[in-house]
Amino acid sequence: GGSPELLQKQRPPRPPEGFSPFEPGPKAAVRPTGLYENILRRVAPYGVRGVIWYQGESNVDRRNEYAALLTAMIADWRSTFDKPELPFYIVELADFLSKDDIGGRQAWAEMRKEQAKVAETNRNTRLIRNSDLGEWNDIHPLDKKTLGQRAAESALETDNK
């Protein structure tokens, strides 16, 4: 509890009217969809055989939305490249955080489940195991070679079918 005056004092100041965390302008790469419009759309006319998707660390706090968002992105990219069966290889989040950080580790485990759900429920998608390569103190595992081999084997196996 507390008085409305006290709560108002504790609230962080509002950003100025018109403030945006993104660079202004239609070509700003850091605005929402900026990377898509400035990079991906430009390579769409070229041949692509598959996509290795290694992302998700920054979405752990919104993990309940992740499966739907990634599924929509996969459908959109397949449409953009005009390849309805474009393979997607989803790299599982590596294990991360100290064994003592039970809440954080639980959140990462739930995120891995969301990634697996996407691979299980979307055609021509695969999950590339990575949870065994993580380190408690580094969000980006040092063992890139093993992960690279797994990704290559998965892609080659799909490509050779």
Describe each PLM feature range:
Residues 1-161:
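Cell-envelope and extracellular/periplasmic
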